[in-house]
Amino acid sequence: MADILGKVVQTIHERQLADADNPVLLMVSGGSDSTALAYLASELQAQGELGQVALLHVNHHLRGKDADDDAAFVQHLAEVLDLPFFLVDVDVAGQAKETGENLEAIGRRERYASASDALSRFCLHLSVPLSFGRVFTAHTQDDRVESFYMRSIVGTGPGGFRSMLYRNGPVVRPLLDVSRDDLREYIRERDAADDADRPVVHDGEGNLWREDATNAHTDRFRAFVRHEIVPLAKQRNPQLLDTLCRSMNLVGDEDDMLDVQANEMMERVVSWTDRTEPDKAVDWADGCVLLPLFGTLPLPMQRRVAFQTLQLILGGDARVETSAVTAITNGFADGKPISGYTGNIQGNLALSANKQGLRIEPMSVYRSRRKQD
């Protein structure tokens, strides 16, 4: 047990994920990974490694009584650990019926929206700046490897092969260096120790964590990878999780370096301020102009600058499409913008190029400007 706790502390310290000044909201489903996260975070709070810890559970109401039992289990877990508890009810099926969206996509969006709202209220209650707050998720080595294979199958950019980030804004994944099997063993050993200072909860059937039966349905992409592909890969390499995670960390380190270079390059090749209104405050959503110098960059750097530019315009949660990045780089040839080039890309953004550069802006702004011209 000490090894798991020590490994998590090492990850938090080395990656500078959080400290005693950071209140932490845990996203807890009741499964083995998030249940272990709750126990570990409770210990880290007691040791002064983290600020005040609270639990959040989002009930999607997709599995009837089982979903309600999950919520009751997590609430009991919070009570036993003497930690604040947030419960959010979401009608995912109702939203899917109204919008036609995928259930998993709605569930993910609602979970993170609920976490953002709960973290804001938690920090306000503690009189702590929101920027200090952290949201801990229970993603493990297993999740990271599964994401790697999923992206390998459907395709991704070079940075996508780093898989999950240890931190993305307030969202932190402190268990990415720990396997699911290790976490389950940690819970079992904690239960066997029967230590009143380190309590363990059971559900109504005596289980140490909740199992979601739908996780075994291999018609779902992640479950297919988890139950079909990863076990086959482990036959060839029993140390698959450690091996692939080391490789992903190497990719991540190089990706970070290239991001720094791209950020520096953006200051030279991206103009966010309208030259007719030089004193106007920058609003990313207004778009920008990629200056002619952009066309002289190596194509991989063009792609990265275009990607980061679109992230700013579309918002940090947007999944930037490869086709949008390609449409931008296609607006340059022979080291300069292609005059007369136009396009319509993700987010209903308009592309238009002349010798001054390639403009990226909302389609409504583009049309208004064209009328004035």
Language model region names:
Residues P170-R173, H227, P231, R246, ...:
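Positions in alpha-helical segments
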Residues R109, D177, A223, P238, ...:
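Electropositive phosphate-/nucleotide-binding environments in soluble metabolic enzymes
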Residues R190-N249, D253-D256, V260, D274, ...:
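Mid-to-C-terminal catalytic subdomains of enzymes
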Residues M1-E228:
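Core alpha/beta nucleotide-donor-binding catalytic domains of modification enzymes
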Residues D68, K97, A223, P238-L241, ...:
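Non-catalytic, surface-exposed connector residues within folded enzymatic/regulatory domains
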Residues I4-S32, E49, A54, V90, ...:
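AMP-forming adenylation/ATP pyrophosphatase catalytic core
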Residues Q75, A115-S116, V230, G252, ...:
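Structural signal for well-ordered, non-membrane alpha-helices
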